[in-house]
Amino acid sequence: MFEKVRKIIAEQLGIEEDEITMESSFIDDLGADSLDIVELIMALEEEFDLEIPDSEAEKITTVGDVVEYIKNNS
């Protein structure tokens, strides 16, 4: 699961996969801005065939948050 999420994040943000850990913050560590995060959420929704409501997306700040959300909701 983490590897699949990491690959999508790397593609969306144009960074190397080895820069991404479960603890990585999208904004602080990976340099994402709010538009990057919206696009990333959309890519993850498509890849994992789920919908992440805005209220939940706002709580997702790290890679681990995304992985946990997908595990609990797919």
Swiss-Prot record:
Which pathway, per its entry?
Answer: Lipid metabolism; fatty acid biosynthesis
Q: Where is the PTM O-(pantetheine 4'-phosphoryl)serine found along the chain?
A: S34
* Encoding gene per record: acpP
* A Pfam family this chain is assigned to: PP-binding
Molecular function via GO: acyl binding; acyl carrier activity; phosphopantetheine binding
Q: Which GO terms describe its biological process?
A: lipid A biosynthetic process
Domain of life, per the record? Bacteria
The alphabetical list of record keywords is:
Cytoplasm, Fatty acid biosynthesis, Fatty acid metabolism, Lipid biosynthesis, Lipid metabolism, Phosphopantetheine, Phosphoprotein
Describe the function of this protein: Carrier of the growing fatty acid chain in fatty acid biosynthesis.
Free-text description of this protein's post-translational modifications in UniProt: 4'-phosphopantetheine is transferred from CoA to a specific serine of apo-ACP by AcpS. This modification is essential for activity because fatty acids are bound in thioester linkage to the sulfhydryl of the prosthetic group.
Name it: Acyl carrier protein
Extract the InterPro entries matched here.
ACP (IPR003231), ACP-like_sf (IPR036736), PKS_PP-bd (IPR020806), PP-bd_ACP (IPR009081), Ppantetheine_attach_site (IPR006162)
Tell me which residues make up the Carrier domain: 1-74
Q: Where in the cell is it found?
A: Cytoplasm
According to the UniProt record, one GO cellular component term is: membrane
Q: What is the lineage of its organism?
A: Bacteria, Bacillati, Bacillota, Clostridia, Eubacteriales
The set of disulfide-linked cysteines is: none
Q: Which family does it belong to?
A: Belongs to the acyl carrier protein (ACP) family.
